């Protein structure tokens, strides 16, 4: 489940019209959500608040052997009007799961960002600042986001920790998204790492208006999207590099059948080949599989996962109301009013099992999880934990 600050950052992307899914780093987002989720350990409590449309705070307290915690602050120059209260927030916005990719949208025109007053430009570029300190480790994380243009964004992330080389590291990303394609230029102070990533979407260009067909029957709707991408990076100090490439096909909302996503990624230097397949088998069920193979060592690994959304049943009195008023429909207080939670499960070929139950109780968001190892009969449970979130 997304924590409060991650959800606020996603709201900033949404308000500034930035598509986080149109990048090479998000190529396997669905498989990671269904197969790479972490089970909580111990007890963790988070209390957060959006004190103003531009300012948010969050406090976290945990107990895993020792008591630890963190304090977070976030500032956004762009007012965020979204409802972040844990009692009313849509669970689909905070629970990672099967991703339905939407149609590519045309980027905003540059002139639409301009604001003039008395013959002078007074507009400012949208900016987000975020800081988090971990106690008692005294580890500090910071994030700087700035929208440079409708198709360009600068992201600078920094970590200060005495356990890291040189006491910390800084990662800089210059991201460009034109709809049809996206690029990322990366530099990290760790080993002076430089990199480049790109993603290209085949099919119609959202920047070009479609031409009117001579006959209506000539219109062929696009039901899926095929994407190809690659990344290349090189460390100047350690004189080592790497690369990977990937393919993805996913259905779009107008697809008449079951939504599904297929990906294939290859790291030729390490010899790793990975393929994933995820399908939305029903309104409340999603299935996913991943097969990894190394053609240098001939080792392979298979993982299976699923998510099952639990929906509330009809109330005991609803049938009686419908008898009296056949046209009555139960009003929904929120988009996920009928959703009680989601159950996630994953298993690999070595007998390692992960279970996760996420949902809402009254005004609290909760995550209850366990990690098991079926091959160790004397100690099957590897970890058990629960996380509670409250936001106002």
Swiss-Prot record:
Bilayer topology term: Multi-pass membrane protein
The keyword Ribonucleoprotein appears for this protein: no
Compartment(s): Mitochondrion outer membrane
One record GO biological process: protein insertion into mitochondrial outer membrane
GO cellular component, one term: ERMES complex
Top-rank taxon: Eukaryota
Gene3D superfamilies xref list: Porin (2.40.160.10)
A Pfam family hit: MDM10
Keywords (A to Z) from UniProt: Membrane, Mitochondrion, Mitochondrion outer membrane, Transmembrane, Transmembrane beta strand
Task of the protein: Component of the ERMES/MDM complex, which serves as a molecular tether to connect the endoplasmic reticulum and mitochondria. Components of this complex are involved in the control of mitochondrial shape and protein biogenesis and may function in phospholipid exchange. MDM10 is involved in the late assembly steps of the general translocase of the mitochondrial outer membrane (TOM complex). Functions in the TOM40-specific route of the assembly of outer membrane beta-barrel proteins, including the association of TOM40 with the receptor TOM22 and small TOM proteins.
Comment field on protein domains: Lacks alpha-helical transmembrane segments, suggesting that it resides in the membrane via beta-sheet conformations similar to those predicted for other outer membrane proteins and porin.
Record note on quaternary structure: Component of the ER-mitochondria encounter structure (ERMES) or MDM complex, composed of MMM1, MDM10, MDM12 and MDM34. Associates with the mitochondrial outer membrane sorting assembly machinery SAM(core) complex.
Membership in a protein family: Belongs to the MDM10 family.
UniProt name for this protein: Mitochondrial distribution and morphology protein 10
Organism: Phaeosphaeria nodorum (strain SN15 / ATCC MYA-4574 / FGSC 10173) (Glume blotch fungus)
């Amino acid at each position: 489940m997304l924590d409060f600050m991650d959800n606020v950052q996603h709201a900033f992307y949404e308000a500034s019209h930035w598509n986080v899914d149109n990048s090479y780093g998000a190529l396997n987002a669905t498989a990671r959500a269904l197969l790479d989720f972490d089970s909580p350990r111990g007890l963790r409590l988070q209390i957060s608040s959006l004190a103003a449309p531009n300012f948010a705070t969050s406090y976290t307290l945990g107990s895993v052997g020792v008591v630890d915690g963190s304090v977070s602050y976030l500032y956004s120059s762009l007012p965020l009007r979204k409802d972040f209260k844990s009692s009313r927030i849509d669970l689909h916005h905070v629970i990672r799961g099967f991703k339905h990719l939407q149609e590519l949208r045309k980027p905003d025109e540059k002139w639409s960002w301009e604001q003039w007053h008395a013959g002078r430009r007074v507009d400012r570029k949208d900016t987000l600042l975020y800081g988090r300190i971990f106690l008692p480790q005294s580890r500090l994380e910071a994030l700087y986001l700035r929208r440079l243009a409708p198709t360009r964004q600068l992201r600078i992330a920094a970590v200060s920790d005495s356990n890291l080389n040189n006491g910390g590291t800084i990662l800089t990303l210059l991201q460009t998204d034109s709809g049809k394609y996206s690029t990322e230029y990366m530099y990290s102070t760790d080993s002076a790492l430089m990199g480049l990533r790109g993603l290209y979407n085949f099919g119609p260009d959202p920047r070009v208006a479609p031409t009117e067909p001579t006959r209506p029957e000539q219109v062929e709707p696009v039901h899926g999207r095929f994407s190809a991408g690659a990344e290349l990076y090189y460390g100047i100090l350690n004189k080592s590099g790497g690369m990977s490439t990937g393919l993805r096909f996913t259905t779009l909302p107008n697809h008449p059948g079951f939504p599904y996503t297929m990906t294939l990624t290859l790291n030729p230097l390490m010899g790793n080949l990975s393929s994933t397949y995820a399908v939305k088998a029903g309104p409340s069920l999603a299935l996913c599989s991943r097969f990894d193979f190394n053609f240098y060592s001939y080792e392979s690994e298979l993982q299976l996962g699923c998510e099952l959304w639990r929906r509330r049943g009809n109330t005991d009195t609803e049938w009686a109301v419908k008898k009296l008023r056949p046209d009555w429909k139960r009003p929904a207080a929120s988009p996920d009013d009928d959703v009680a939670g989601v159950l996630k499960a994953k298993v690999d070929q070595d007998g390692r099992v992960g279970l996760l139950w996420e949902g809402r109780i009254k005004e609290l968001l909760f995550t209850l999880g366990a990690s098991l190892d079926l091959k160790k009969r004397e100690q099957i449970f590897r970890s058990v934990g629960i996380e509670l979130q409250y936001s106002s």
